[in-house]
Amino acid sequence: MAQFFKPQKRNKSVSKTLKGQVSALDHQARAVVRAAVKGQSTRFIMGALPGEVIEYKTAGKHSGHLERILEPSSDRREVPCEYYASCGGCDFQHIDEQKQLAHKRQVVEELFQKFGVFNPQTSSLPWQEPLVSEPMRYRRRVRLATRWLGKEQKLLIGFREAQSHHIVPIEDCLVADEILLHCVNTLYPLLNTSTVASKLGHIEAINTNTPVILLRITEALPGDAMQALQEWQTVNKTNIWLQSENDLQPLAGAAMPFDTSIDGDKLYFQPGDFLQVNGGINQRMVQQAMDWLKPEKTQRVYDFFAGIGNFSLPLARRAQSVLAVEGVYRMAEQTRINAESNGMDNLSSLSADLNEITASDLGKPADLWCLDPARPGAEGVVKLLHKLKPEHRPQRILYVSCAPDTLARDIAGMLTESKGCNYRIIGLSTVDMFPQTHHIETMVCLERAS
């Protein structure tokens, strides 16, 4: 017999304005406001600092929105960006860079302790100096949202508000390379027409060897618009690429962009490929990776999550051979092309599912491993390490992470003695890849005990 259920009505929480004192920052740089009265929830609020007394508006069960700062912290600074209150990009400009770095180091320590990587009562972590970035104008890649306002006949270009689809129109971004927004602003008159803007998804601006504008389009642009873009590209010496649902093509005359390795090798890429946003700090990070791994001409290396070869090519310059393993086929192919174009015959590329990677996929064991996974981490590679015979495990492992929670989980897995993993941490540092934001980049180097 069919049974019919009447859906329960959801109780909408009524927003209240409350006063409270911030006790700490959580791992996402949100202020923690403990419940002052029984029945109230602990709230997590972006934009406030420890010790501050604030007025906030409740949202949902545990969130809140900062309304006013009644008693500011001495650590608070004047925010330099006029869009900071509404833009969803930066979320940490209200505290200086040194304290940003101190907070990020503390987050890593707390997570390492939580996952059992170390016990502060009996040991300490071998922290080295952080790799520090320029605090502003460091981004060489930005992605901008667009919306065509039909009634006003106007194209909005900007960043989205935090936790919102609303677009904040901007003319400049203080953390972006000045040339990026200059290119977009110069191109704006050609985009601000119904025939173009109504077909526009988003815009990506990149600057490595030369500026690149990637236009995401939902349908083909008319011939006169294409001609205008072609002329603009020539005059402004900026390459334009068009991306549709199933295709990515440069305009005629647009060259393939490239990044440059620490050895001067060219790393060609397509717009849309993964590229570290902070070019200056990326160079220092790769150099530190070489210093920590110490590859030699007698050694074989696995580079997992290799991308377009950011670590693979410098490793190949120093090691006997490198196997670059990447989950995205197109980028694995790009690594192969980059090795070939730079005259390297000791670098091979493999496209494989890194969640299910096995020793038989890789061939001969490697002396050194390099890992640079996305936020979900490298559980599949950790499982591979556990399954290897002790004599087939690498001498050193370098792990670069943009997510400290999955980093802590994976490092704990690599140190698991019950799995026969006899490693110790010999290097650890934060990498200032994303100043003015709560995002954390970390490098860890493990060495197998003799």
From Swiss-Prot:
[4Fe-4S] cluster binds at residues 81, 87, 90, 173. The active site is at 402 (nucleophile). Coiled coil: none annotated. GO terms for molecular function: 4 iron, 4 sulfur cluster binding; iron ion binding; RNA binding; rRNA (uridine-C5-)-methyltransferase activity. Its EC number is 2.1.1.190. S-adenosyl-L-methionine binds at residues 276, 305, 310, 326, 353, 372. It catalyses: uridine(1939) in 23S rRNA + S-adenosyl-L-methionine = 5-methyluridine(1939) in 23S rRNA + S-adenosyl-L-homocysteine + H(+). SUPFAM superfamilies: S-adenosyl-L-methionine-dependent methyltransferases. Gene3D superfamilies: 2.40.50.1070, Nucleic acid-binding proteins, Vaccinia Virus protein VP39. The keyword Methyltransferase applies. It holds the Pfam family tRNA_U5-meth_tr. InterPro entries: 23S_rRNA_MeTrfase_RlmD (IPR001566), MeTrfase_TrmA_AS (IPR030390), MeTrfase_TrmA_CS (IPR030391), NA-bd_OB-fold (IPR012340), SAM-dependent_MTases_sf (IPR029063), U5_MeTrfase_fam (IPR010280). The keyword 4Fe-4S applies. CDD domains: AdoMet_MTases (cd02440). Keywords: 4Fe-4S, Iron, Iron-sulfur, Metal-binding, Methyltransferase, rRNA processing, S-adenosyl-L-methionine, Transferase. Belongs to the class I-like SAM-binding methyltransferase superfamily. RNA M5U methyltransferase family. RlmD subfamily. This is 23S rRNA (uracil(1939)-C(5))-methyltransferase RlmD. The gene is rlmD.
